[in-house]
Amino acid sequence: MSIPLFRRETPIRALDVKALNLLMRNGRATWAELGQLLGLSAPSAADRVRKLEQRGVIRGYAALVDPASVGHPLTAYVSVSLASHRNRAAFLRAISKMDQVAECHHVAGDDDYLLKVRCRGTQDLDHLLATELKDKLGVARTRTTIVLSTAKESVHVPIDAVD
């Protein structure tokens, strides 16, 4: 008997999948545009999206900003190992306040966390690693990979319908 890793409370219907895919491509679509593409009235499309928001399927909306255009051209992935797991709560609180940290993932393997960071340059990255992480947060070790170019970066999430 297999046990699913994740369980949805309410199934995602085919029309919800279509709405989500449309919104992931264009989060600024009007209710009228969305309704037309879904074969619904604008109020029905709005109701469907609001239900997805209330269920937590849609967590929010954001502008996708080019980091280089706003002075943060350097992207790096930083694997972090904490000196002690007693430092975990303080580490997570501090990370959540750091603007340069775009993502923080608790991971399996040799390291504890994987961070995606955006910096102004290598000096900014060095300061983040040496001063912010290692000196202040009880980080035992970091391993950094600097991104040279990005072939694909997407906010699209693959979704399976359950009808």
Predicted regions and their residues:
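A compositional/biophysical signature of low hydrophobicity enriched in polar/charged and small residues
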Residues: 1-163
